[in-house]
């Protein structure tokens, strides 16, 4: 999933691949951090379990790759979501609502504590929309 095509520019866009001095340099240019969030759940016989996180991750990576006006950094994806209604199906992994919201809030607080002020969550799972919105109001 983390295999992101490179265009030869050697532009690092993935949080987990960056070095400390690269973060410090990026902060000077008021970067945006994108947090892909989704879920691992059943999607019937036609889709893999990771479709809800794979799509926002690759979308975020493509945006980060294409934007040159300022740094865009893709945070590690939040692959565990709120999908309790699919727990009757094999392959589904769900967090409790409070756990999911606390996870998103803690990740945002941690990113902000690193000096990043512009944070965008890109959601790929419908069940996460309202919980993410509630966290954004805090």
Describe these PLM feature segments.
Residues 35-43, 76-78, 82-85:
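Short, conserved active-site loops that position catalytic residues or coordinate cofactors/metal ions
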Residues 65-71:
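Short helix-capping segments at alpha-helix termini
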Residues 31-33, 71-73, 120:
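Structural motif
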């Amino acid at each position: 999933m983390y295999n992101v095509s490179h265009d030869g520019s050697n532009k690092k866009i993935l949080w987990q691949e960056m070095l400390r001095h690269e973060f410090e340099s990026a902060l000077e240019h008021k970067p945006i951090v994108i947090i892909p969030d989704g879920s691992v759940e059943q999607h019937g016989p036609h889709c893999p379990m990771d479709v809800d996180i794979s799509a926002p991750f690759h979308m975020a990576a493509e945006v980060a790759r294409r934007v040159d006006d300022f740094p865009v950094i893709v945070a590690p994806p939040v692959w565990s979501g709120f999908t309790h209604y699919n727990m009757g199906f094999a392959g589904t992994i769900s967090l409790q609502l409070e756990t999911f919201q606390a996870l998103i809030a803690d990740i945002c607080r941690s990113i902000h504590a690193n000096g990043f002020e512009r944070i965008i969550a890109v959601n790929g799972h419908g069940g996460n929309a309202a919980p993410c919105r509630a966290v954004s109001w805090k």
